[in-house]
């Protein structure tokens, strides 16, 4: 098939704030037979094109080797031993395991590979109870992030509880007690009920139909969080509105009477319970965050405790500052282990782990292997965490407090075939703001302006891009490619103020930062516009969409994954309404003006565009696949150049989680054969 399938342009549109929006592809928002047939034709066109590339099969052996490596997920320590998910080299999904000691053999508790013949069923998360005797886990199908929750007994491996069709839930809203657990349940995707939320309590051994409700009054923009602790008499309930603010409440265990802890502050509060003490990482009066604490036993339950002060001597201040804000680093997370407070900091987009005593005095800094990223840290006596960098695959590490170094518990057997160099480089954006990017390349690569390069970014929701090990980038880097990862405004790399500088009416700054990064790569001899591609997914897909519509001259190719693109209708389906705190609402006249200005779908015009590969998942329950469908159709009709506009919709996949390795390999072969062909790489 030499040209894309014809797409029916219908006489449809809608009125928004007295403006008529012509939308001939509005019908592609449906899920009927016409759309299914159109999607199948687009898949055939994309498959024909990608399948014709010789490079695709030449890359396959290396990609299979990279994918078929035993991988290790974080360790969760409990009183009776260690839980961990591990994926064997020949498996599609990781299995959930347990071992009493780190030197003992793992025993498989749950194997999702046996739950379906095609790898469509996955176990995406799990939470052991404090003594490790029980473990709850979430089971989803086709990557849709809609869960059944099952509970098994660790010793016997037997399932003792099963809650069906719980909805969009996870460990962030799950809390064990001695006799049961708090959990979030939502409506289903099919009936548009994902934004209908309820926090319930389930007592082990009882009928789930008898579960009682702790809270059910949540706005569409608000998501709850739950925090419990084995030594606490209380449960903490958080109401987080977008990425904007958090209200905190608490209740005695077993009671549905909630009391206000922090309500009405325009700041984020992330609580950790330690007995009846609450430690909170907060942005209130601290763009770089600080740690405060309070004893729930000392809080007057008849009043709303909204004063979060900075003085530990003020008797009228319920919260005391334990760890003050730093001006050179962002406090991102905390955990309490024994009498120590461990804080993960982000400084210049690289992580640090710092240990404080109970009074907030710094005891030590955990020695990390290099400039990289830390995730999933915690423990009972020792500290466990995951570490990775651009040149080191994720390893599970253990740190005994006071030691000189960390020890490796588990590490995959992946190594690069060449020496790589990583630099962090700064450049000026359109308004003069200095923005950094990591640049990864072969150490002996000549910067002669003629190397293929891929620029990756995100720039939103206070999400920070820190060093990561991308195994499928390795063949590209080894063959002389350049990878650049830009830390754009809208992210969290430099605190709440950096996030606010790139959201709502300031969203264009994110795109300008990305364009400046592209120009920096060209001006410094890393690449040329003829060999530069942009790459991003989800909110990063919006970034890619804005890049190819605003600056098609900068890029030769683009990969745009599970994207948001029709920004006048993003809020009408799935989780879109939740994101109005980040983008603004098109229903608001003021927000409508600046959103329409950059909305990629509404900025497509007849001209020559770079080659684009759009990808989406048919079971995506976050970003509606209609964004990719409508954008691909409009760009195919508008393309006056010779480069292809492709759309690949993947079956039995969602936004990204729960994807079997076999599908990951095919997806990566599509992306990198496309990029390799367009950039003359490999």
For the regions a language model picked out, list residue spans one by one.
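Beta-propeller blade signature
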Residues: 98-99, 150-153, 197-206, 249-253, ...
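Asp-box/WD-like beta-propeller blade repeats and closely related beta-sheet repeat scaffolds
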Residues: 106-125, 136-139, 143-190, 197-200, ...
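Blade-edge beta-strand/turn elements of extracellular beta-propeller
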Residues: 112, 155-166, 206-218, 254-261, ...
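Cap/lid segment of the alpha/beta-hydrolase catalytic domain
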Residues: 113-126, 143, 401-404, 409-533, ...
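Polar, glycine-rich mid-to-C-terminal structural blocks
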Residues: 197-240
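Active-site-proximal cap/loop segments of hydrolase catalytic domains
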Residues: 488-682
């Amino acid at each position: 098939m030499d040209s894309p399938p014809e797409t029916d342009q219908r006489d449809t549109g809608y009125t928004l704030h007295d403006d008529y929006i012509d939308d001939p592809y509005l019908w592609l928002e449906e899920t009927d037979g016409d759309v299914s047939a159109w999607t199948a034709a687009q898949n055939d066109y994309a498959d024909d094109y990608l399948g014709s590339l010789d490079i695709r099969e030449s890359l396959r052996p290396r990609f299979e080797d990279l994918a078929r490596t035993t991988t290790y997920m974080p360790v969760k320590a409990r009183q009776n031993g260690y839980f961990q998910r591990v994926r064997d080299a020949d498996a599609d999904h990781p299995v959930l395991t347990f071992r009493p000691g780190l030197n003992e053999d793992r025993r498989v508790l749950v194997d999702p590979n046996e739950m379906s013949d095609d790898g469509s069923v996955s176990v995406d998360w799990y939470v052991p109870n404090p003594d490790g005797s029980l473990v709850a886990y979430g089971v989803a199908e086709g990557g849709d992030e809609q869960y059944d929750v099952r509970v098994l007994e660790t010793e016997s491996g037997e399932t003792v509880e099963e809650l069906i069709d719980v909805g969009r839930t996870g460990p962030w809203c799950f809390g064990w007690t001695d006799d049961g657990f708090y959990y979030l349940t939502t409506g289903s995707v099919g009936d548009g009920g994902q934004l209908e939320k309820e926090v319930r309590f389930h007592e082990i051994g009882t009928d789930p139909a008898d579960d009682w409700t702790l809270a059910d009054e949540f706005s569409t923009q608000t998501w709850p969080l739950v925090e419990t602790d084995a030594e606490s008499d209380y449960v903490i309930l958080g109401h987080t509105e977008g990425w904007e603010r958090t209200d905190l409440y608490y209740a005695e265990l077993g009671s549905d009477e909630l009391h206000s802890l922090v309500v009405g502050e325009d700041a984020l509060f992330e609580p950790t319970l330690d007995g009846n003490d609450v430690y909170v990482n907060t942005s209130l009066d601290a763009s770089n965050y600080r740690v405060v604490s309070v004893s729930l036993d000392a809080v007057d339950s008849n009043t709303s405790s909204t004063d979060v002060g900075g003085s530990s001597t003020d008797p009228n201040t319920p919260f005391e500052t334990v760890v003050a804000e730093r001006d050179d680093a962002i406090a991102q997370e905390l955990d309490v282990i024994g009498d120590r407070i461990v804080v993960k900091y982000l400084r210049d987009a690289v992580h640090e782990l710092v240990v404080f005593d109970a009074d907030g005095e710094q005891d030590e800094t955990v020695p990390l292997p290099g400039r990289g990223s830390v995730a999933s840290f915690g423990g009972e006596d020792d500290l466990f965490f995951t570490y990775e960098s651009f040149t080191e695959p994720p390893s599970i590490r253990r740190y005994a407090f006071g030691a000189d170094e960390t020890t490796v518990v588990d590490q995959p057997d992946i190594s690069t075939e060449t020496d790589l160099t990583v630099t962090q480089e700064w450049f000026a954006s359109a308004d003069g703001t200095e923005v950094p990017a990591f640049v990864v390349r072969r150490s002996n690569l000549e910067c002669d302006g003629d190397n293929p390069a891929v620029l990756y970014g995100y720039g939103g929701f206070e999400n920070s891009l820190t060093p990561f090990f991308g195994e499928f980038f390795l063949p590209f880097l080894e063959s002389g490619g350049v990878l650049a990862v830009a830390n754009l405004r809208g992210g969290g790399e430099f605190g709440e103020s950096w996030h606010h500088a790139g959201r709502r009416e300031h969203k264009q700054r994110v795109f300008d930062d990305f364009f400046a990064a592209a120009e920096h790569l060209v001006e410094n001899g890393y690449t040329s516009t003829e060999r530069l591609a942009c790459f991003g997914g989800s909110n990063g897909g919006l970034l890619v969409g804005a890049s190819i519509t605003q600056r098609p001259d900068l890029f030769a190719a683009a990969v745009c994954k599970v994207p948001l693109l029709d920004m006048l209708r993003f809020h009408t389906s799935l989780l879109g309404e939740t994101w109005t705190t980040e983008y603004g609402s098109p229903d608001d006249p003021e927000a409508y003006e600046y959103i329409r200005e950059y909305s990629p779908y509404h900025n497509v015009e007849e001209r020559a565009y770079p080659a684009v590969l759009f990808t989406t998942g048919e079971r995506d329950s976050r970003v509606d696949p209609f964004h990719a469908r409508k954008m691909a159709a409009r760009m195919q009709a508008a393309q006056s150049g010779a480069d292809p506009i492709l759309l690949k919709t993947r079956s039995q996949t969602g936004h990204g989680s729960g994807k079997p390795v076999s599908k990951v390999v095919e997806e990566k072969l599509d992306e990198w054969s496309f990029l390799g062909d367009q950039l003359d790489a490999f």
